[in-house]
Regions:
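N-terminal intrinsically disordered, cationic/polar leader segments
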Residues: 2-66, 70-78, 82-207
C-alpha cells in the first residue's frame, strides 16, 4: 500500500480539494460535494492539480494508513467528477422493481419489501444526490449499454441502477438490494450484479 500512497492524486479540471483541521477533506466537483475525515496521522497537501499524501514514519501501521488515505482521497475525486454506478438485474417470473417516490419497491415472490435501513434522503432523486436509484426504460438500457453487459435477456423493471458520488455508499446500497433475494444456485432466480457469474448446481433427479 505504501507504493500506492506515494502516487499523487490528480485533481481534474472543475474539482477542488480542501484540507481543514484534523484532516477533514472537502472535495467539490460537477457532480456534488463530499466531506470526510481521513486518518489524522497522514499529511495531505494540495499543489496545483495534484494532492499528495505523506506519512510520518515507515512503521507498518503508517504504511498501511498511507495507502488507505490515498485510495480514499482518490475515490472522493473520482466520485465528484465521474461518479460511481452499480447495475443489478432481477431474474424470476413475476419479479420486478418499481420506483415509487423515495423508495424502490421490489416484488420478489413474497411480501412487498421497500428497501430500508438507510437515511430516507438517499432515495430522493435530485440534481446532486449522494445515491440515486433508477429503474431505466428500455431506451435508457440501450443508451447506457446495459444490455451489452450480460448475455441474459434484460428489460425495463428488471434492471436497477444505483448511482452516486460516494463509492462506499453506492456499493453498500447495491448490497442491500441484492441481499433482499440473492440469486439461488439452481435456477438463478433473484437479484444479482449484472456482471455476476452465478455458479449453478444440478438439482436432484428422480429415480
Amino acid at each position: 500500500m505504501s507504493r500506492i500512497g506515494r502516487m499523487p492524486v490528480v485533481i481534474p479540471a472543475g474539482v477542488t480539494v480542501q484540507v481543514a483541521d484534523n484532516n477533514v477533506v472537502t472535495v467539490k466537483g460537477p457532480l456534488g460535494t463530499l466531506e470526510k475525515q481521513l486518518p489524522e496521522r497522514m499529511t495531505i497537501t494540495v499543489d496545483g492539480n495534484q494532492a499528495l499524501v505523506t506519512r510520518p514514519t515507515d512503521e507498518k501501521e503508517d504504511r498501511s494508513l498511507h495507502g488507505l488515505t490515498r485510495a480514499l482521497l482518490q475515490d472522493m475525486v473520482i466520485g465528484v467528477s465521474e461518479g460511481y454506478k452499480k447495475v443489478l438485474m432481477i431474474i424470476g417470473v413475476g419479479y420486478k422493481a418499481v420506483k415509487q417516490g423515495n423508495n424502490l419497491l421490489l416484488y420478489l415472490g413474497h411480501s412487498l419489501m421497500p428497501v430500508t435501513g438507510m437515511p430516507q434522503e438517499r432515495f430522493i432523486i435530485s440534481d446532486t444526490p449522494t445515491v440515486k436509484l433508477e429503474v431505466p426504460t428500455e431506451d435508457e438500457i440501450k443508451k447506457q449499454g446495459i444490455d451489452k453487459m450480460t448475455t441474459e435477456k434484460v428489460s425495463t423493471s428488471l434492471i436497477i441502477v444505483v448511482r452516486g458520488i460516494d463509492k462506499q455508499e453506492v456499493g453498500q446500497m447495491a448490497a442491500v438490494i441484492r441481499g433482499k433475494r440473492p440469486p439461488e444456485p439452481y435456477h438463478g432466480k433473484g437479484v444479482r450484479y449484472i456482471e455476476e457469474n452465478v455458479r449453478r448446481r444440478v438439482g436432484k433427479t428422480g429415480k
